[in-house]
Amino acid sequence: ATPDGTCVRDYVHVADLARSHVAAAKRLAAGTPIAPVYNLGSGTGLSVREIMSATSRVTGIDFEPGINPRRPGDPAVIVADGSLAARDLDWRMRHTVDEMVRSAWEALRAADSAAPHETKDSL
């Protein structure tokens, strides 16, 4: 079970992921051994409802998400233990959930404004 009944997942900002790749590449280039796999995450995760609350807060759009039952076989909680990446790569998440949502929202708005829009005359 989860605190609010929705699945908990570990969300990571793409910039934080990119920093981990750079840190690993620098270690490899220096000839320093690294682990074959690094899990990247907060170790705690956020529920789907918490992500939806952050989305509403950041975008200013008030909405009530429709929450469906968990799919068969879908784990209630999946989070990553980033302690190995912290130790070897000095990696930690820097971005908060609000920053992640804001970044995604701004990218979506920029892509939408750059896309050609149909007009009545072009139909």
Where are these regions (language model features)?
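C-terminal substrate-binding subdomain of Rossmann-fold SDR/epimerase-dehydratase oxidoreductases
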Residues: A1-L123
